[in-house]
Amino acid sequence: MGTLTLRFSTGLTGAMLIYYLAELHRHGGPHVSSITIAVFTAAFFAAELILSPLFGSLADRFGYHRIMQFGPVFGATAVILTGLTTNLWLLGATRWLEGASSAASVPSILGFIAIATLADEGLRGKAVARFEAATLAGLGAGIVAAGPLWTLLHRDAFFLNAVVYGISWAIYRFGVADPRAAHGGHAHGQRTSLARYLQILSGAHVWLLAPTWIAVNAAIGLWTSQSIFQFVQGPDPRFANQRLMAGASPLLVSAGLAVGMLVFFAGLVYWGNRFKKMRRTTIIFYGLCGGAALVAAAVAINHGGDLPVIVTLVLLVPVVGGLFVLAGSTPAALGLLADMSEPYPRDRGAIMGLYSVFLGIGQIIGSLAGGAAADRSGIDGLLLATLVMLAIAVLPLWWLRGVEHQLDADVRPGAGAQG
């Protein structure tokens, strides 16, 4: 519940900020371009990228329970400031605070999962899928709620969101205990220094996972904010032939996002329950193929203004199916990262903090590339850039699969029959 409410607030702020920036000139601020949206989104993930290893190490030293409570405090401060200003520099600073919110909480939660699922790959698959599901459900619900709340409350909705952050803090404070005592404890007073952190990373296999995970997150990052901005801004005469750039209302965008989030959520649950029967890399490969099918169908829809309605409905089938399959790549990659933390029981928080690092790098690349692509070619640019990122993600899978065989021998004996 803590992850759900925290991510709800994160998604709500992110989407409402897009609506706010799209009409910032009406509130006395400047006009905002696609590039500005990209920079703001990148700032959020840059903060998460830079601060996650630090907070992961602090969680290993001081306890997961204590450190995760900083997240909602940073988030509440950010949304209050967002509702009070139209200054782009201050709004950019609030994106850093929001990123710090995620950086403080996520490594602590993932360290908890890594300890709680020791020696049980079935439980680990379900746990990481549920973490991703809670993350997606929270972000999705926040993004979907942003349209109605912005329509009803406008800037006052940011202050309401601060209350939700307060609820998240209360859940972490009173509803979560540090798991290390229940598992024999790895409590230690040794500081996880930068040198120690680099030593851990040099001995782990995480760098083989990094290219695929970064590219997948870049593909997702292309759409996290740019798509909303492209959908809701007024029609651009340069892209009059693109059906998806007709200037939709926030309520319509929220409805479409709700359907997409439900499909993605269902995919997370389905593929997370396949860890015992299928290799992580196999699930990731299927996900990348599903993403490519989604892009191809979306291109046809975007240029299908003259197509009969029945043909458009048929094209929605590979969009929905591709999204469902693509969803499996996220818990599979997270499961691999948890497997790689097994040899480092005292440093799980630091290693699992790489989840946010890789996510942050991918989202920064995706956000900036998406801003440039959308500014140049609209939705077509986003779709082409997505296909490029998916192609990059599939390239390292062969080497990653070899590492997975080694992990099977080390921590999952008897798993060699997996497909």
Q: What do these predicted ranges mean?
A:
Residues A177-P211, G414-G419:
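Juxtamembrane intracellular "pre-TM" segments in multi-pass secondary transporters
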Residues L49-T86:
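Conserved MFS/SLC helix-loop-helix module at the cytosolic interface between two early adjacent transmembrane helices
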Residues T94-T135:
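Cytoplasmic helix-loop-helix junction between adjacent transmembrane helices
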Residues R66-L81, T282-A298:
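Structural signature of the two symmetry-related core transmembrane helices
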Residues I50-G63, A266-R280, A374:
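Helix-to-loop junctions at the C-terminal end of transmembrane segments
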Residues L4, W89-A104, V309-G328:
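Hydrophobic core of transmembrane alpha-helices in multi-pass small-molecule transporters
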Residues F44-P53, L139-G140, M261-V269, Q363-I364:
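Residue-level signature of mid-helix packing/kink "hotspots" within the transmembrane helices
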Residues G28-A43, K126, R130, P237-M261, ...:
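Loop-to-transmembrane helix entry
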